[in-house]
Amino acid sequence: MMQEETFYSVRMRASMNGSHEDGGKHISGGERLIPFHEMKHTVNALLEKGLSHSRGKPDFMQIQFEEVHESIKTIQPLPVHTNEVSCPEEGQKLARLLLEKEGVSRDVIEKAYEQIPEWSDVRGAVLFDIHTGKRMDQTKEKGVRVSRMDWPDANFEKWALHSHVPAHSRIKEALALASKVSRHPAVVAELCWSDDPDYITGYVAGKKMGYQRITAMKEYGTEEGCRVFFIDGSNDVNTYIHDLEKQPILIEWEEDHDS
């Protein structure tokens, strides 16, 4: 059993013009969940990721690891579908439609979209209440940082081959995060596109439709990203934040699980 082995949460964040706390520009972040023997390799990979990012050259970086004491849950990745669109306008229109299909009202979707430009500097995710149409979390610029999830490479590569998806670490990380977030009972849907100027694909994810990639969500060269979790829950928002930050999750795809 996997549980016998001790796992470590490894995290990286990099910024330019000082640390994030000092108002520096966010460059890159990374989250891994690994056994100890992969530590050197993982730390080097995160270092490389932070140093070679298209958002710029960092002058502040932090890499930390800690032992995880909570028991690790293993889950399936969300099913993936790629939607080819010809322009960001078409992509955003489709995203709104998919959010509605997933159970977010049109009114709440529009309220979120009105505020998305203001949230472009939020480093983590914004939690948005589907009842009030207001932001729930009080984390301001920091956002909620989903952590402690990973997808072991060998299994991911097998999945990518089977799913006819390129085996890029970007897809691995995004799908691992979306799969962890989506399994939370209070999360109705996630809307995301990257703050990386070189990457314009985004997605809508949810329990009903899985992970819906959309090939154009913004113009090339723009550094405004988005990550919004639409929440339907009466519990205290801090319990949701705790789950997303602390519950350790490993993705493990099994071929017969996919329809």
Curated annotation (Swiss-Prot):
Q: Name one GO molecular function term.
A: 6-carboxyhexanoate-CoA ligase activity
| A Gene Ontology biological process term | biotin biosynthetic process
Catalytic activity, reaction form? heptanedioate + ATP + CoA = 6-carboxyhexanoyl-CoA + AMP + diphosphate
Q: Which UniProt keywords apply?
A: ATP-binding, Biotin biosynthesis, Ligase, Magnesium, Nucleotide-binding
Assigned EC number? 6.2.1.14
Pathway(s) per entry: Metabolic intermediate metabolism; pimeloyl-CoA biosynthesis; pimeloyl-CoA from pimelate: step 1/1
Pfam families assigned: BioW (PF03744)
Cofactor(s) required for function per UniProt: Mg(2+)
NCBIfam families named among the record's database cross-references: bioW, PRK01322.1
Q: How does it assemble?
A: Homodimer.
Q: Could you tell me what this protein does? A: Catalyzes the transformation of pimelate into pimeloyl-CoA with concomitant hydrolysis of ATP to AMP.
Which named protein is this? 6-carboxyhexanoate--CoA ligase
